[in-house]
Amino acid sequence: MLESIPPILRPESVEPVALKNFAEKFNLEVVGDPEGVLLTGISMNTGDLRPGDLFVAMPGKKTHGANFVAKALELGAVAIVTDQAGLDLIGVSQVPVLILENPRAHLGDLAAFVYGNVPGNLPKLFATTGTNGKTSTSYLLEGILRQLGEVTGLTSTAERHIAGEVIVSRLTTPESPEMQALIARMREKGVTSVAVEVSAQALSQLRVDGMHFDVVGFTNLSHDHLDDYEDMQEYLEAKLPLFTKKRADRGVVCLDTVYGKAFVKQSEIPVVTITSQMGVDADWHVGITAETPAYTSFVLAGPNGVNIRSRVPLLGAHMAANAGLAIVMLIEAGFSAERIQAAIQNGIEAYLPGRTERVTGATGPDVYVDFGHSPDAFLNTLAAVRKVTEGRVFMVFGADGDRDASKRPAMARVAAEGSDVLIITDHHPRFEDPASIRKALFDSAVEARPNLEIYEVSPPEAAIRKAVSMAKPGDAILWAGPGHQDYRDIRGVRTPYSARAEARAALKENGWA
């Protein structure tokens, strides 16, 4: 069974844009007659195209979008934007063709204009980037905004939120036509503040072009995505454009990794700094006051003696650091520390699907399902679990196929060093041999801790059952990798699958209800 793909979210009503005005706005050459042509949407993908759309035909990795113009016209496209190469492929067109070299570089601005997302007509926009913590920070930011009385929107790896409506996500950061349509839908629903999770890939592919954020935040940078970027320096440089005058007014940088200083040094916009580390010089400091399996209490200390106390409904000091970053971003946006303290004095109200999510029953071992899939994520989460666990710590994990393989040895090493019992299983093998992935992880784990109790169990539903069958009350199980995801990718087929549901079922089968 294939995973259903959520539809593109668009505003329910759009003020049509005259193609003639559109062409004049962007100074585009028009082949054909634009007179009387009205645009009600924009798409770069025929799978999302609707009647009245402007179809943007761009060169791709394998083929040119101009090869899909016939399909676009069948679906109701009323005009085409393409480059000279695309025009040559199209030949004689039934609809007007607008010539624009490098359409992708302008796609965000084109989409913003079509959907009426112009300065003075937008909600407050917040963006968070980093290797780990950007989803959590975005959810916490949205939660605090809601407690402050804002009507909120969210776009993240896990979900999209529009004034309380929840929709499954397709990408961490959607392509710019989808993003602009989403923002327009949020405006239509009265959203006043939006938290946006921004990946390095989104910045490299210009998906947030056409957007200008009130405040942007940086969480951290660690080993990941080196299948997309040559090295850590290139990965860093992919994220830096979020801290430019083109994209934001102000920034908040976490100094918990060495790359934070690079952001401060290279930022084009004013930034303030935050840390949860002792001995690090920063404007704001996060200190932990209590940790339990259900929540982490903290104090955020800042300039002029400001102290904000609250708790986050998640396990781990790293989650408190994410909450601190979210709070400082709000202060930089103009919300007063006093108002924020009053709103969150009894805790931050947010549900983060698959982020150290505790799926434990009333009895039995604590079981956490987490999305973390990098060495640094493993390190932080294992440390947090260890701190609140009296008994043994079990870890269940696998590695993504057809993704950055260079991080696998470090993932296995951290997993081995941080657990008492390690169970290696499958994650998304994609087109790789899952047995080969497991063997590589197993070998690295054994090398790190030769005497550790290590098992190789496939498929993952058997792996979690193995862990639960071995665990006792007082023990904890961390299943790292699947998090919120509701599928497994096996040879290009996304099969419905929920790690959280499997974990709950395993607990029930073992009498831990």
Task: Outline where the language-model segments fall.
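Residue-level signal for inorganic ion chemistry
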Residues: 22, 53, 72, 110, ...
